[in-house]
């Protein structure tokens, strides 16, 4: 093939180039560049081509590299990714024949590398036959060559030729292009060392020779703009002019293109039509392109040597890329848009190449059988095209061809309007992105629709990729919609064969009606979506044709698969029928819409289609038209919904593929539906469809993704429709339909690949979403009542729709969630769907037919799903149950309410849903790290839910109760992120509701831990029944996670409620302790089960175990304190542990250091239940804590914490949270020790100002062309998140958090824990120890504990922000070296030992005298001593961004050193005693003699420093450290319930090189450790300097329960309160269980002689203390 890649005009040419470029990279890259390079000078382009010609052997990448620099500035893409224009080498004879782009595309076959060379040649011939498009392509190629030649004669023409050459995919192709230019020599000139004089070079130009490569070229010193002007340009042959104009940005060639299409259509010379705009060659962009090209030429960039070098570098870089990331993310910055478009088009072309024979044949009936437009739909999604080409080529291609044909038809109709040109531009961009190149292609032949269709069909077979792109480009520019109508019919008849002919006929009918603004009738037929779009567009105006072409083309790309698919599906009759029926259904809905608002629908359709495409591409919002912009932002807002929706879309696709009958009934019923209702349904579908497009792109692995595109197109028609009044009701129907179809399909998929496949797809979707800013909007929408409404909207869509597009988006998300859930649980889904349909129909009250159709579909889907779901349900019962929480967390609150009905469906969906939602939750975790990031927004989108996931266990139960009780009862507090994103919605709920929710959570976890759950259920079954009432237990399970996701948390005045609850909690603490032991036993059982489970199941089970723990904790909370309300916190899945300032330092910040401990994330609430019922009623618990603390204060010195407890209600002010670990260290007034400078105000050597760094990164990213991708990777410092999460600070309860600690261990998100007591954090950390799948995959304990992340989530899902990944400082301590992380991975066990030392409540902690002593010492020490331990912990807190804005980069990479408090490398060696003293004033204060224990001071010191952080941190550590540690951490969690938050909990996190990651937690300072949350992954002991005071009674009860729980949980987990870290000699009893490695032999430190466990000591045989030195 001949490829001309304009150097400067790459962006312009890239549009065509994309179509021509077969390589995926080339596809994406050229598109951006085309768009970016607005004014690339054609001559420059030619020059690049010439240079490329010399580098014939060079890879197209190299050519791209050459061209990139000018385009980079314009497109912000790397040079090596410049788009290429592949011009088929048309002999001079052919050149006039093939002026159209299609010809150029078809001529692309020249490169032998392409598989379809022969096909392309055939296509070229076909293109000749269909001279219009082919002529345009040939003209482009010829124009480039002619320009090059003309320029060759004069240096100016040569400049042009290199530009065209730049697009060459291969040197040979470029040679052909240049060789085709008369008198232009492409022969590689002998490179002589002699430098030709200017005169000599000018003389050579007469022979057609010009140097386009070396810096010696005369062009390097020539003013290109003097050469490239209208006068010289007019000297070129018309064909050359036309082709060169194609390289210019659309703005500079619109007028000419409008005329050109007619000429192309007529096949006449395009010269007559070619008229450059006044400023096309005289503008800053063109001038810059000329200058850049000259600079690159003078720099020697185009020399063969440099080209080869650039090529190798590009290949080397590409080889470094992770295939998964390469699939879902642009490999290079700035490459996303252009390359995404190119890839989409190219991939679609690749698929179309397979389909091309059929598609081409389409215009020519023979090809119809091979039509596989599905690939076009797949094409819509970049990722799908890339990776699914091989897997989905058959299915996709079959569908794609139809889509192409339909697109051609629909696009053909619309081209008539003048708007068509404008819309075409937008569509071009949009379509390029969504790789709806077929649609654009269809439109591309601006001359006549007939030609367009033929060209498209021809191009698809010849070079589906290449031809597609040029067609799209041309189609967009060309607006000859009127002519298109008739030709469309002809083309359609050829291409469509049976179905397509019908479609075309329908389209023809539509086209006329469209023109006449009566497109409804035709649309319902096979091309429903495209037709609908076109019809709507036509209805608005005849110009709507342009809109239709723009909107219809996207719709065609996305939706076309349905209608054309019947034809294309001929090979796949089932799929074809299904898609056709589905399309018909959609069409009917769209059809109905069109009558309602012709103008509105047209506008809406256009916006929707573009939006859908954008969605599938996940690239540009800007391309949307005005309506699109208004609505698309909302949809983008629901981009998160697209995550879920993506799954839904996938399901829809598969459903449409598999269940033919259900889609058809939908179609019939829909057609009957009223236009208004259909509009609404379309509107509903549109957001879901956009998500579907996303899903298809993300889940291209799923064969059904093509179907998703159709869904998108149909819904695309109505995205604006929801704005119309009738839209609401209809939207629900559309959503239901989409959900049903999606469910049916997804269920099948899930059966095939129940967990991993979906999770991978989900991950892809999620990451795509991360790239989108839309999620942010969605999250805000999802938060608060809107979220509920949205969930209801999924069911009761109508109510919310009128409220706002945001609601629609959320509705779509909910629907997607529902669909996901439906997929997973077909049986449950049946009920859910029926209910949804019923609710929707009732609420809509628009059309009973719609509801009936939906019901029919639902029934069929239910039947189909029931079969699949039954299988999946039995197979994945435990996993699903585990996943249920995560899924529910993703479900909106309204959905959770509705989840009462839908619960089982959601549960069944849990596995696939969990995969998808896990992605979201992982995203959420990332979000928690950086709420500002788009990824954070994404998680918020689908997840306010995901945020809630952490809270899920506790909140989920609460929300179902709330839902059951009434929305009115719920009082919402919406947390807003620093970005203004809604972090979460907090519902003020009575403890009873919370308890009920907890029961629900427990119920959900039953499958994972049947016995434990059964007991819990028995305990709370009545409450659950009350809550559930009408809802099934499964729905309850769903509801619980949903409620948790909703982040329903109460912020009650801690002072009032806390005192009341304090007594109750104290009384109940004993019960909780008893329960805790039983629960711990259950947890152990669950943990073992999790360990045994498969890796993915392990993750799910681990989540389930965490949920169980949470539920148990919640139960304990309920039992302990049935206080009116629990403090609910939106637990962002932030893995970041925020350290709260010592209560003394900033009571508000400490918010109750003790209370903080009690405040976990979602889990924190659960923990609160266990630790002190106070959390259940956060305000009460905080006061209770205060009361207890006051009592303790009487007993102890820590009165400070009482104030913080009261303050706990307040979120930590940004200033309140210590911005740096150093600050935290400074806060502890206690002397840390001899060697420590922790008290100094100076920051530690590795300290990083996270907030400032984050701001800098934000600014850099904002200015980066790759901002979409980068935003997802940037995670806000936990301090920022905490500051903006008042709920997190809510210090729900309380110091009693001993229970809190337990639940926290299960799954308290670190970020939430930050506010919550350290015990909460510890619980979170501990929860995931056994999720072995991949410790990374667990995504940090926070996520797992939250259960927000599906076990199946690959570690990559978290992306950079994932806590498990050290790239991100976020949840994991960046200080933690990856090496260590790797080391940790091997270690499956992370033991968090909680030394229960009720400091303030020491008197109460009679159960354990040591704990009491420790607590007394702690209280004596006051929070400050705790803080000192924290200071040591800060090093470990490095990873915890939560409270400190400064992250300490861990300096010591020694495995053992991780647990030690950071020490200057120059610090003198410390004796064990010294180390204890220094690191743990708490230990000595707590009465735990560090040195006396006989263990290396480093071990105890670690614990000591951890004391402040106490259990919460340790649990958190375990979680973050290793998801696999979860079980142990869970075990620890219950020990953590050490009642005394006030007592500094010593958390010693030890990274054992041997592999088991052991987190040592001394529970002595639980209260002070409120802030001391530690990510397990951090290995850092985070001790908060919260006052050790804690309610004495809770402390006593907690310590008792904890030890019991510890014993039950694990011998290792059993921590003697005082003896956890004590050396074996000191406490014989405790020693065995104290250390995670206590079972291992003791080794003497080579340096200080301290006894250390073999696992605790590194290879150097040095204790932690010595290692630090």
UniProtKB/Swiss-Prot annotation:
Q: In which tissues is it expressed?
A: Highly expressed in nurse cells and deposited in oocytes late in oogenesis. Ubiquitous in early embryos. Late embryos show higher levels in CNS and neurectoderm.
Mapped zinc finger ranges (PHD-type)? 1602-1666
Q: Name one GO cellular component term.
A: PR-DUB complex
MF terms (GO), sorted A to Z: chromatin binding; deubiquitinase activator activity; DNA binding; zinc ion binding
InterPro entries reported for this sequence? ASX-like_PHD, ASX/ASX-like, ASX_DEUBAD_dom, DEUBAD_dom
Q: Motif (NEF motif) spans which residues?
A: 283-285
Q: Where is the composition biased (Polar residues)?
A: 367-378, 413-425, 434-450
An example Gene Ontology biological process: regulation of gene expression
Q: Where is the composition biased (Low complexity)?
A: 635-650, 666-718, 1174-1192, 1404-1436, 1592-1610
Annotated region Disordered: the residues are 90-109, 336-378, 410-478, 635-718, 952-972, 1174-1193, 1398-1437, 1482-1505, 1587-1610
* Renumbered ranges of motif LXXLL motif 1: 224-228
Q: Which residues form the DEUBAD domain?
A: 215-338
Map motif LXXLL motif 2 onto the chain: 244-248
Keywords for the protein's UniProt record, in alphabetical order: Chromatin regulator, Chromosome, Developmental protein, Metal-binding, Nucleus, Repeat, Repressor, Transcription, Transcription regulation, Zinc, Zinc-finger
UniProt-annotated location(s): Nucleus; Chromosome
What PANTHER family does the annotation carry?
Answer: ADDITIONAL SEX COMBS LIKE PROTEIN ASXL (PTHR13578), POLYCOMB PROTEIN ASX (PTHR13578:SF20)
Free-text note on domains in this protein's UniProt record: The DEUBAD domain is involved in modulation of the ubiquitin C-terminal hydrolase activity of caly/calypso. It contains two Leu-Xaa-Xaa-Leu-Leu (LXXLL) motifs involved in the interaction with caly/calypso. It also contains an Asn-Glu-Phe (NEF) motif involved in stabilizing the association of the PR-DUB complex with ubiquitin to promote deubiquitinase activity.
Q: What does this protein do?
A: Non-catalytic component of the polycomb repressive deubiquitinase (PR-DUB) complex, a complex that specifically mediates deubiquitination of histone H2A monoubiquitinated at 'Lys-119' (H2AK118ub1). Activator of the PR-DUB complex involved in ubiquitin binding and allosteric activation of calypso deubiquitinase activity. PR-DUB does not deubiquitinate monoubiquitinated histone H2B. PR-DUB is required to maintain the transcriptionally repressive state of homeotic genes throughout development. The PR-DUB complex has weak or no activity toward 'Lys-48'- and 'Lys-63'-linked polyubiquitin chains.
Q: State the name under which the record lists this protein.
A: Polycomb group protein Asx
Source organism per UniProt: Drosophila melanogaster (Fruit fly)
